[in-house]
Amino acid sequence: MKIHHLFQPHFRLIYLFIWGLIISGLSDLTWLIPLNVLAVSLFFISLQFSQKSFLPYLKRWFALVIFIVLMWATLSWKIGENGIELNFQGIELAEKLSLRTHLLLISLWLFLWNINDAVLVPSHWQIAFARKINSTFCADRTLHCTAWRIASKNGYCHARSWISSSA
């Protein structure tokens, strides 16, 4: 197997999934901060070499920053015995979550570098468990549609009986 085969889109999705699991298990700031610095550095180096525009990435990153600010706004305080107090556990959790989400976003950009939607959509079918997930999704969707039809028919029948009984 040649080395470039290991960087095919479906393998990148698998690597990204495993990396996401690793990131979600990290809780030590001495690991999260250097990994964020490394990921951002690699991202900017990749941008420099490919000569892509930073603007689309900046818009997505700004949406993440808004989410992180809202997360900090909700986790950094609590209502205690003396009214509103600082929540030090919440601040610590907000630090970890913001570093994790930032690392996940930058990692997503790096792992899916130069992959557009036309390549990404067919690549998930090459993963072994994708068929099972898609079958489950289709079965769930069918069940939803059937339940909706039954509920709408029952509602229609109930409405007809209500109309006929009131007339």
From Swiss-Prot:
The keyword Metal-binding is annotated on this UniProt entry: no
Regions crossing the membrane: 13-33, 37-57, 61-81, 103-123
Subcellular location(s) per record: Cell membrane
Membrane topology summary: Multi-pass membrane protein
Gene Ontology CC: plasma membrane
Keyword Transmembrane helix: yes
Entry keywords, A to Z: Cell membrane, Membrane, Transmembrane, Transmembrane helix
Protein name: Uncharacterized protein HI_1620
Organism: Haemophilus influenzae (strain ATCC 51907 / DSM 11121 / KW20 / Rd)
